Protein backbone atom coordinates (compact mmCIF):
# COMPACT_ATOMS: atom_id res chain seq x y z
CA UNK A 1 0.00 0.00 0.00
CA UNK A 2 1.36 3.41 -0.99
CA UNK A 3 2.49 5.56 1.91
CA UNK A 4 0.92 8.93 2.71
CA UNK A 5 2.77 11.56 4.76
CA UNK A 6 0.86 13.59 7.35
CA UNK A 7 2.37 16.87 8.54
CA UNK A 8 1.76 20.29 10.04
CA UNK A 9 3.34 23.61 9.09
CA UNK A 10 6.96 24.73 9.02
CA UNK A 11 8.39 25.83 12.39
CA UNK A 12 5.90 23.44 14.00
CA UNK A 13 4.15 24.20 17.26
CA UNK A 14 2.68 21.57 19.57
CA UNK A 15 -0.57 21.29 17.59
CA UNK A 16 1.29 20.80 14.29
CA UNK A 17 3.35 17.93 15.72
CA UNK A 18 0.75 16.27 17.92
CA UNK A 19 -2.09 16.50 15.41
CA UNK A 20 0.13 14.93 12.74
CA UNK A 21 0.81 12.02 15.10
CA UNK A 22 -2.83 11.70 16.15
CA UNK A 23 -4.27 11.89 12.64
CA UNK A 24 -1.72 9.51 11.15
CA UNK A 25 -2.69 7.02 13.86
CA UNK A 26 -6.40 7.43 13.07
CA UNK A 27 -5.77 6.96 9.35
CA UNK A 28 -3.73 3.83 10.07
CA UNK A 29 -6.59 2.46 12.15
CA UNK A 30 -8.84 3.09 9.15
CA UNK A 31 -6.51 1.20 6.80
CA UNK A 32 -4.22 3.86 5.33
CA UNK A 33 -0.43 3.54 5.31
CA UNK A 34 0.08 6.94 6.96
CA UNK A 35 3.24 8.30 8.57
CA UNK A 36 3.54 11.54 10.56
CA UNK A 37 6.52 13.75 9.71
CA UNK A 38 7.59 17.28 10.65
CA UNK A 39 8.85 20.28 8.72
CA UNK A 40 11.02 21.78 11.44
CA UNK A 41 12.58 21.48 14.87
CA UNK A 42 10.58 20.24 17.84
CA UNK A 43 10.10 23.00 20.43
CA UNK A 44 10.85 22.61 24.13
CA UNK A 45 7.14 22.66 24.89
CA UNK A 46 6.38 19.91 22.38
CA UNK A 47 9.34 17.83 23.56
CA UNK A 48 8.00 18.08 27.11
CA UNK A 49 4.70 16.58 25.93
CA UNK A 50 6.39 13.84 23.89
CA UNK A 51 8.62 12.89 26.82
CA UNK A 52 5.78 13.00 29.35
CA UNK A 53 3.63 10.61 27.33
CA UNK A 54 6.62 8.59 26.07
CA UNK A 55 5.95 9.09 22.37
CA UNK A 56 8.70 9.37 19.77
CA UNK A 57 8.62 12.55 17.70
CA UNK A 58 8.08 12.36 13.94
CA UNK A 59 11.11 12.38 11.67
CA UNK A 60 12.15 15.59 9.92
CA UNK A 61 11.69 16.13 6.19
CA UNK A 62 12.30 19.17 3.99
CA UNK A 63 10.76 17.74 0.84
CA UNK A 64 8.05 15.14 0.33
CA UNK A 65 7.78 14.46 -3.41
CA UNK A 66 10.94 12.34 -3.28
CA UNK A 67 9.06 9.93 -0.99
CA UNK A 68 5.35 10.01 -1.80
CA UNK A 69 2.76 11.18 -4.29
CA UNK A 70 0.06 11.98 -1.73
CA UNK A 71 0.05 13.97 1.51
CA UNK A 72 -2.34 15.14 4.22
CA UNK A 73 -2.01 18.58 5.81
CA UNK A 74 -2.92 19.31 9.41
CA UNK A 75 -2.96 22.66 11.22
CA UNK A 76 -2.27 24.67 8.04
CA UNK A 77 -3.23 25.12 4.42
CA UNK A 78 -1.23 28.09 3.09
CA UNK A 79 1.40 26.98 0.58
CA UNK A 80 4.23 29.09 1.96
CA UNK A 81 3.80 27.42 5.36
CA UNK A 82 3.96 23.90 3.92
CA UNK A 83 6.61 21.59 2.49
CA UNK A 84 8.99 23.26 0.04
CA UNK A 85 7.80 21.05 -2.82
CA UNK A 86 4.11 20.92 -1.89
CA UNK A 87 3.22 21.83 -5.50
CA UNK A 88 4.73 18.52 -6.63
CA UNK A 89 2.40 16.25 -4.63
CA UNK A 90 -1.33 15.73 -4.35
CA UNK A 91 -2.99 16.96 -1.17
CA UNK A 92 -5.58 14.34 -0.21
CA UNK A 93 -6.96 16.03 2.90
CA UNK A 94 -6.67 19.13 5.05
CA UNK A 95 -7.69 19.25 8.72
CA UNK A 96 -7.27 22.80 9.98
CA UNK A 97 -8.61 25.68 12.07
CA UNK A 98 -7.02 28.69 10.34
CA UNK A 99 -7.97 31.11 7.60
CA UNK A 100 -7.88 29.68 4.08
CA UNK A 101 -5.41 31.49 1.83
CA UNK A 102 -3.03 30.78 -1.05
CA UNK A 103 -4.43 27.28 -1.43
CA UNK A 104 -5.92 25.47 -4.40
CA UNK A 105 -5.96 21.93 -5.76
CA UNK A 106 -6.53 20.33 -9.13
CA UNK A 107 -8.74 17.61 -7.64
CA UNK A 108 -11.60 17.61 -5.12
CA UNK A 109 -10.32 16.84 -1.62
CA UNK A 110 -11.59 16.22 1.89
CA UNK A 111 -11.24 19.59 3.58
CA UNK A 112 -12.28 20.07 7.18
CA UNK A 113 -11.75 23.48 8.72
CA UNK A 114 -13.61 24.53 11.85
CA UNK A 115 -13.54 27.78 13.85
CA UNK A 116 -12.15 26.16 16.99
CA UNK A 117 -8.97 26.81 18.92
CA UNK A 118 -7.02 23.72 17.91
CA UNK A 119 -6.78 21.06 15.21
CA UNK A 120 -6.74 18.37 17.91
CA UNK A 121 -10.26 19.41 18.92
CA UNK A 122 -11.45 18.50 15.43
CA UNK A 123 -9.51 15.22 15.53
CA UNK A 124 -11.18 14.31 18.81
CA UNK A 125 -14.52 14.49 16.98
CA UNK A 126 -13.17 12.48 14.06
CA UNK A 127 -11.99 9.64 16.29
CA UNK A 128 -15.50 9.45 17.74
CA UNK A 129 -17.18 9.73 14.34
CA UNK A 130 -15.13 6.77 13.12
CA UNK A 131 -15.64 4.70 16.28
CA UNK A 132 -11.91 4.54 17.03
CA UNK A 133 -10.70 4.57 20.63
CA UNK A 134 -7.95 7.10 21.36
CA UNK A 135 -4.90 5.55 23.01
CA UNK A 136 -3.85 7.08 26.33
CA UNK A 137 -0.57 8.42 24.93
CA UNK A 138 -2.23 9.97 21.89
CA UNK A 139 -4.95 11.50 24.05
CA UNK A 140 -2.18 13.12 26.10
CA UNK A 141 -0.62 14.62 22.99
CA UNK A 142 -3.98 15.90 21.73
CA UNK A 143 -4.62 17.46 25.14
CA UNK A 144 -1.18 19.08 24.97
CA UNK A 145 -2.04 20.59 21.59
CA UNK A 146 -5.25 22.15 22.92
CA UNK A 147 -3.50 23.52 26.01
CA UNK A 148 -0.76 24.99 23.82
CA UNK A 149 -3.04 26.63 21.26
CA UNK A 150 -5.45 27.95 23.89
CA UNK A 151 -2.73 29.06 26.35
CA UNK A 152 -4.39 26.85 28.98
CA UNK A 153 -7.90 27.94 27.91
CA UNK A 154 -7.13 31.68 28.24
CA UNK A 155 -6.82 32.57 24.56
CA UNK A 156 -9.78 34.23 22.80
CA UNK A 157 -9.52 31.47 20.19
CA UNK A 158 -10.53 28.91 22.82
CA UNK A 159 -14.11 27.68 22.41
CA UNK A 160 -16.39 25.55 24.56
CA UNK A 161 -15.62 22.71 22.16
CA UNK A 162 -11.91 22.99 22.94
CA UNK A 163 -12.50 22.95 26.70
CA UNK A 164 -14.86 19.98 26.45
CA UNK A 165 -12.42 18.05 24.24
CA UNK A 166 -9.56 18.82 26.64
CA UNK A 167 -11.53 17.49 29.61
CA UNK A 168 -12.36 14.28 27.72
CA UNK A 169 -8.76 13.80 26.63
CA UNK A 170 -7.38 14.54 30.10
CA UNK A 171 -9.57 11.77 31.48
CA UNK A 172 -8.30 9.30 28.88
CA UNK A 173 -4.70 10.43 29.44
CA UNK A 174 -5.19 10.27 33.22
CA UNK A 175 -3.75 13.73 33.94
CA UNK A 176 -5.01 16.92 35.56
CA UNK A 177 -5.27 19.32 32.62
CA UNK A 178 -4.55 22.46 34.62
CA UNK A 179 -1.54 21.17 36.56
CA UNK A 180 -0.05 19.36 33.58
CA UNK A 181 -0.80 22.31 31.30
CA UNK A 182 1.01 24.83 33.46
CA UNK A 183 4.10 22.59 33.62
CA UNK A 184 4.05 22.18 29.85
CA UNK A 185 3.69 25.92 29.19
CA UNK A 186 6.52 26.67 31.60
CA UNK A 187 8.71 24.19 29.74
CA UNK A 188 7.87 26.00 26.51
CA UNK A 189 8.63 29.37 28.09
CA UNK A 190 12.14 28.27 29.06
CA UNK A 191 14.14 29.94 26.31
CA UNK A 192 17.56 29.54 27.92
CA UNK A 193 20.15 28.15 25.58
CA UNK A 194 18.32 29.35 22.46
CA UNK A 195 20.21 31.39 19.88
CA UNK A 196 18.60 34.55 18.49
CA UNK A 197 18.08 32.74 15.18
CA UNK A 198 16.25 29.95 16.99
CA UNK A 199 14.11 32.39 18.98
CA UNK A 200 12.75 34.13 15.90
CA UNK A 201 12.01 30.85 14.11
CA UNK A 202 10.60 28.72 16.97
CA UNK A 203 7.04 29.51 15.92
CA UNK A 204 7.17 31.69 12.82
CA UNK A 205 4.67 31.85 9.98
CA UNK A 206 4.69 33.77 6.73
CA UNK A 207 1.56 35.49 5.41
CA UNK A 208 0.51 37.42 2.33
CA UNK A 209 -1.49 40.46 3.47
CA UNK A 210 -2.75 42.44 0.51
CA UNK A 211 0.42 43.19 -1.43
CA UNK A 212 2.61 42.84 1.64
CA UNK A 213 4.77 39.89 2.61
CA UNK A 214 4.68 39.50 6.39
CA UNK A 215 6.26 37.09 8.85
CA UNK A 216 4.96 36.78 12.41
CA UNK A 217 6.94 34.88 15.04
CA UNK A 218 5.73 34.28 18.56
CA UNK A 219 7.34 32.99 21.74
CA UNK A 220 5.90 32.54 25.22
CA UNK A 221 7.78 33.74 28.29
CA UNK A 222 7.25 33.99 32.02
CA UNK A 223 8.75 37.49 31.80
CA UNK A 224 8.99 39.33 28.47
CA UNK A 225 12.11 41.16 29.66
CA UNK A 226 13.96 37.84 29.67
CA UNK A 227 13.66 37.95 25.88
CA UNK A 228 13.72 41.68 25.16
CA UNK A 229 16.98 42.15 27.05
CA UNK A 230 18.44 40.78 23.80
CA UNK A 231 16.59 43.29 21.59
CA UNK A 232 19.66 44.61 19.78
CA UNK A 233 20.73 41.09 18.80
CA UNK A 234 17.16 40.17 17.85
CA UNK A 235 16.86 43.20 15.59
CA UNK A 236 20.07 42.25 13.83
CA UNK A 237 18.95 38.70 12.97
CA UNK A 238 15.39 39.83 12.13
CA UNK A 239 16.73 42.50 9.76
CA UNK A 240 18.77 39.81 8.01
CA UNK A 241 15.64 37.68 7.54
CA UNK A 242 13.69 40.69 6.25
CA UNK A 243 16.36 41.33 3.63
CA UNK A 244 16.81 37.67 2.70
CA UNK A 245 13.09 37.00 2.21
CA UNK A 246 12.09 40.41 0.91
CA UNK A 247 9.63 40.93 3.75
CA UNK A 248 7.68 44.13 4.27
CA UNK A 249 7.27 43.39 7.96
CA UNK A 250 8.60 40.97 10.54
CA UNK A 251 6.63 41.10 13.78
CA UNK A 252 8.23 39.26 16.69
CA UNK A 253 5.69 38.79 19.48
CA UNK A 254 6.71 37.91 23.04
CA UNK A 255 3.72 36.73 25.08
CA UNK A 256 3.69 36.74 28.88
CA UNK A 257 1.91 33.51 29.90
CA UNK A 258 1.12 34.94 33.34
CA UNK A 259 -0.35 38.35 32.40
CA UNK A 260 -1.68 37.41 28.93
CA UNK A 261 -0.17 40.56 27.42
CA UNK A 262 2.40 40.71 24.64
CA UNK A 263 5.18 42.95 23.41
CA UNK A 264 5.63 43.28 19.66
CA UNK A 265 8.98 44.03 18.03
CA UNK A 266 8.34 45.34 14.51
CA UNK A 267 11.06 45.47 11.86
CA UNK A 268 10.67 46.36 8.18
CA UNK A 269 9.53 49.16 5.92
CA UNK A 270 5.89 48.52 6.90
CA UNK A 271 6.47 48.57 10.67
CA UNK A 272 4.20 51.60 10.92
CA UNK A 273 1.25 49.36 9.99
CA UNK A 274 1.51 47.85 13.48
CA UNK A 275 0.95 51.31 14.93
CA UNK A 276 -2.07 51.82 12.69
CA UNK A 277 -3.51 48.37 13.39
CA UNK A 278 -3.33 48.59 17.17
CA UNK A 279 -3.45 52.37 17.60
CA UNK A 280 -0.26 52.28 19.65
CA UNK A 281 3.05 54.07 19.10
CA UNK A 282 6.17 52.06 18.41
CA UNK A 283 8.90 53.14 20.79
CA UNK A 284 12.34 51.79 19.98
CA UNK A 285 10.58 49.45 17.49
CA UNK A 286 8.43 47.88 20.24
CA UNK A 287 4.86 48.26 21.47
CA UNK A 288 2.92 46.66 24.31
CA UNK A 289 -0.12 44.80 22.99
CA UNK A 290 -2.49 44.53 25.94
CA UNK A 291 -4.49 41.30 26.06
CA UNK A 292 -3.03 40.04 22.78
CA UNK A 293 -2.08 36.37 22.95
CA UNK A 294 -3.42 34.83 19.73
CA UNK A 295 -1.66 35.25 16.39
CA UNK A 296 -4.59 33.63 14.60
CA UNK A 297 -7.35 35.79 16.06
CA UNK A 298 -5.73 38.96 17.36
CA UNK A 299 -2.78 39.56 15.04
CA UNK A 300 -3.25 38.11 11.54
CA UNK A 301 -6.76 39.50 10.88
CA UNK A 302 -5.95 42.86 12.50
CA UNK A 303 -2.80 43.34 10.42
CA UNK A 304 -4.43 42.01 7.25
CA UNK A 305 -7.20 44.60 7.58
CA UNK A 306 -4.67 47.36 8.21
CA UNK A 307 -2.63 46.40 5.14
CA UNK A 308 -5.74 46.29 2.96
CA UNK A 309 -7.15 49.59 4.25
UniProtKB/Swiss-Prot annotation:
Binding-site residues, Mn(2+) 2: 15, 75, 97, 149
Entry-linked InterPro entries: DDH_dom, DHH_sf, DHHA2, DHHA2_dom_sf, Mn-dep_inorganic_PyrPase
PANTHER family in UniProt: BNIP - RELATED, MANGANESE-DEPENDENT INORGANIC PYROPHOSPHATASE-RELATED
Subcellular location: Cytoplasm
Name of the molecule in the record: Probable manganese-dependent inorganic pyrophosphatase
Alphabetical keyword list: Cytoplasm, Hydrolase, Manganese, Metal-binding
Record note on cofactor: Binds 2 manganese ions per subunit.
Cofactor(s) in the UniProt record: Mn(2+)
GO cellular component annotations of the record: cytoplasm
Gene Ontology MF term list: inorganic diphosphate phosphatase activity; manganese ion binding
Catalytic activity from the UniProt record: diphosphate + H2O = 2 phosphate + H(+)
Family classification: Belongs to the PPase class C family.
Organism phylogeny: Bacteria, Bacillati, Bacillota, Bacilli, Bacillales
Binding sites annotated in the UniProt record for Mn(2+) 1: 9, 13, 75
EC number(s) recorded for this UniProt protein: 3.6.1.1
SMART domains xrefs: DHHA2
Amino acid sequence: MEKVLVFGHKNPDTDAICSAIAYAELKKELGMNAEPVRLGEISGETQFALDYFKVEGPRFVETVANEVDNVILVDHNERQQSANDIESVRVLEVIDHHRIANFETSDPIYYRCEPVGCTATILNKMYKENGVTIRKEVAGLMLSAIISDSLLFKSPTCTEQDVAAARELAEIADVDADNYGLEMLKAGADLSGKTMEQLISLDAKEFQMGNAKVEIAQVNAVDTNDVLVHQAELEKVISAVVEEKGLDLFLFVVTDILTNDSVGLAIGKAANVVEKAYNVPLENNTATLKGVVSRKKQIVPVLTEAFQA
